[in-house]
């Protein structure tokens, strides 16, 4: 099942409605959000249908309770650390580490993401993200862009803490959440394009840590909430930092992240905030 948040183009809705996509139609769900739908707070209203061409898709979870972004692809870890003269620590193989990102800075498909102030090295990061359901288990998957300001991040992390301002200005999610009965997050081609040019390619199956390990580590000594986001981390070659060509994003660039079985998340880089 493909779930979404959507707004009919002829209506001005602040948050949108939850829906289920079937072919070229969207069926509205009798719930306020996908989080409430996951907890059993809604069902399909068969009479509230819209043509997919007549709606705008929104971020499937507009303000998640939390965003944990993991570090699950060995190629990305190895290349990123090698650029700083570092090896992959043994502990990386033992635990699926993560950092917390900013739930208040989530963007949906087709939205312009403001170019952050004080950076000259804006980067995309190609990731798969799990969305937690009402039972604390993974309910489905979406595409995630963990936007990064590399020069800010580089400065901050010299202190031994972070990332902070190098990351918390934007995370994009979308275009849909595909439930685990249709997509289990074990494989699928991952591609990033900038202005139509392919820049990155990898596969979900290259993850070192499993989704079970990621979910269980996230839940240890705490409680996962409906709508929590668990990012996979960047696939190998899935960011400009890793490519090493210095072709950083500029205002007006169109970034498309595509994951086989999930969809295409497209955003335009906006003007400086």
Please give the residue ranges for each predicted region.
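Glycine-enriched loop-and-adjacent helix/strand subsegments that border the catalytic/binding cleft
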Residues: 61-215, 221
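Charged, cofactor-coupling segments
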Residues: 1, 5-24, 156, 165-178, ...
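A conserved acidic, glycine/proline-rich C-terminal tail/linker
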Residues: 210-249
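N-terminal non-catalytic cap/leader segment that marks the start of a structured domain
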Residues: 1-96, 254-258, 273
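Extended hydrophobic-aromatic, low-complexity segments
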Residues: 200-203, 228, 266-268
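Generic structural signal for buried aliphatic residues
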Residues: 128, 230-231, 255
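Residue-level structural signal for beta-strand termini and adjacent loop
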Residues: 32, 204-205, 270
């Amino acid at each position: 099942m493909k779930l979404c948040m959507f707004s009919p183009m002829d209506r001005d809705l602040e948050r949108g409605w939850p829906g289920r996509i079937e072919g070229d139609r969207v069926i509205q769900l009798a719930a306020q959000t996908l989080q409430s739908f996951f907890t059993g707070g809604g069902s399909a209203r068969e009479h509230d249908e819209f043509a997919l061409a007549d709606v705008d898709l929104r971020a499937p979870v507009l303000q998640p309770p939390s965003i944990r972004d993991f570090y699950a692809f060995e190629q990305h870890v190895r290349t990123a650390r090698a650029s700083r003269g570092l090896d992959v620590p043994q502990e990386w193989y033992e635990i699926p580490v993560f950092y917390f990102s900013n739930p208040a800075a989530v963007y949906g498909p087709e939205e312009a993401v403001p170019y952050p102030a004080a950076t000259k090295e804006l980067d995309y990061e190609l990731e798969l993200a799990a969305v937690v359901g009402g039972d604390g288990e993974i309910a489905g998957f979406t595409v995630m862009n963990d936007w990064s300001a590399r020069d800010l991040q580089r400065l901050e992390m010299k202190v031994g803490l972070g990332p902070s301002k190098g990351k918390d200005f934007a995370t994009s999610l979308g275009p849909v959440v595909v439930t685990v009965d249709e997509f289990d997050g074990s494989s699928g081609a991952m591609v990033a394009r900038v202005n139509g040019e392919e820049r990155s390619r990898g596969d979900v199956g290259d993850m070192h840590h499993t989704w079970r390990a990621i979910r269980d580590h996230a839940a240890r000594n705490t409680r996962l909430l409906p709508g929590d986001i668990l990012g996979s981390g960047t696939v190998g070659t899935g960011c400009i930092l890793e490519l090493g060509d210095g072709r950083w994003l500029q205002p007006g660039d169109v970034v498309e992240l595509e994951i086989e079985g999930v969809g295409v998340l497209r955003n335009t880089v906006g003007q400086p905030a």
